[in-house]
Amino acid sequence: MGLLTILKKMKQKERDVRLLMLGLDNAGKTTILKKFNGEDVDTISPTLGFNIKTLEHRGFKLNIWDVGGQKSLRSYWRNYFESTDGLIWVVDSADRQRMQDCQRELQSLLVEERLAGATLLIFANKQDLPGALSCNAIQEALELDSIRSHHWRIQGCSAVTGEDLLPGIDWLLDDISSRVFTAD
């Protein structure tokens, strides 16, 4: 029995999943986390550092790391990569000006060895705002079709209303579960 098999079996018992939520500043990462946890989202301030929430969902114990996206904090993102099962990349669909910056940052994450194998969920947030780019437009702008190193999906959503957060999280958990948790 190899080390990987032993680790998978240990994780199977706990059904622990580590999710890392990243994206540019003001994309809505903290709002998504709070909404998913049933917390009030009326007063959200920029994350200077990180938030960690541990939640139960569908029999999984989710450890969600929400890391600030300001330019000055991005160099610290690599400190959170270890043992990540799923990467949630949050995009502000209404911020057309920073789509290229968003694409560049995402592509730099996808070549990180410590994120190899992590499932990628892209939340195209703020779909409720006028002028928000469609998922197809974001998929093209971020060059998602070129991603071969990770299983990925783009999911339109609104963190403020909570619309379509669950389908994204459920897909992410299904994909991680099929890779990490083996049947005995």
Curated annotation (Swiss-Prot):
One GO BP: regulation of microtubule polymerization
Compartments where found: Mitochondrion intermembrane space; Cytoplasm, Cytoskeleton, Microtubule organizing center, Centrosome; Nucleus; Cytoplasm
Classification via SUPFAM superfamilies: P-loop containing nucleoside triphosphate hydrolases
Cross-link (Glycyl lysine isopeptide (Lys-Gly) (interchain with G-Cter in ubiquitin)): K71
Main location class: mitochondrion
Modified residues (Phosphoserine): S45
Lipid modification (N-myristoyl glycine), residues: G2
Positions of GTP binding: 23-30, 66-70, 125-128
Keyword Ubl conjugation in record: yes
Domain of life: Eukaryota
GO CC, one annotated term: centrosome
Tissue spec. comment: Expressed in brain, retina, lung, cerebellum, liver, kidney, hippocampus, spleen, cortex and heart (at protein level).
Family statement: Belongs to the small GTPase superfamily. Arf family.
Protein name, per record: ADP-ribosylation factor-like protein 2
Species whose genome carries this gene: Rattus norvegicus
